[in-house]
Amino acid sequence: DWLTIDICDEGDDDRLFRLIADADVLWHVLQPATAEVIAAAPKLRLIQKIGVGVNTINLEAARARNITVCNMPGTNSQAVAEATVMLMLSALRRGMAFHDATRRGDGWCMDPSVFDQIGEILGRTVGLIGYGEVARRTAPVVAALGARVLYTATAPKDDAVGEWRDLKSLLVESDVISLH
């Protein structure tokens, strides 16, 4: 009886405001923890973001009430890095065009206008804009596949996989650009 966990679906504002009135902790996923939500929670002591960013939490309202805000940095970096590489490969290999053709029953078209545009990451230059945790995990994977890696960040990183460039140079030199 010392712990009660209530679940509220995203977008169910009526239930949210009913529950938040007696909540000590808000486990926050996507629905914004606005100043209005925080004001409706007189007992609230902690907002725990189940994820990385806190951009959906009104930090000023939480700070004004001395409510602690926590997040989970790095928890999805590997998954996002893997998805980044998958999307690069899919774009280069024209994955969606072949997927759509297969779903229509057309099979794999050997039409040169489609087939000749298929590329590999080998020999390409991949530019990473930003060099946080996701880019740090993406860089060695694309390098292992044979890509040249460039990155831009506020300053060159000693432990980076790849070569630092200013943004303009990175955009000019890169075949594939990934925002991080």
Segments from the language model and where they lie:
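An N-terminal-biased, well-structured beta-alpha scaffold segment characteristic
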Residues: 1-69, 172, 179
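Short gly/ser/thr-rich secondary-structure transition/capping motifs
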Residues: 5-11, 27-29, 104-113, 158-164
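Short loop/edge segments at beta-strand edges and connector loops
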Residues: 7-9, 73, 153, 166
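Positions that flank functional sites
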Residues: 13, 35, 77-78, 157
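Short, acidic/turn-prone active-site loops that include or flank metal/cofactor-
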Residues: 51-54, 74-77, 155, 170
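Short, charged, surface-exposed secondary-structure boundary motifs
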Residues: 56-60, 79-83, 159-162
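Phosphate-binding beta-alpha-beta segment of Rossmann-like dinucleotide-binding domains, i.e.
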Residues: 65-67, 73-125
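Rossmann-like dinucleotide/phosphate-binding beta-alpha-beta segment
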Residues: 112-180
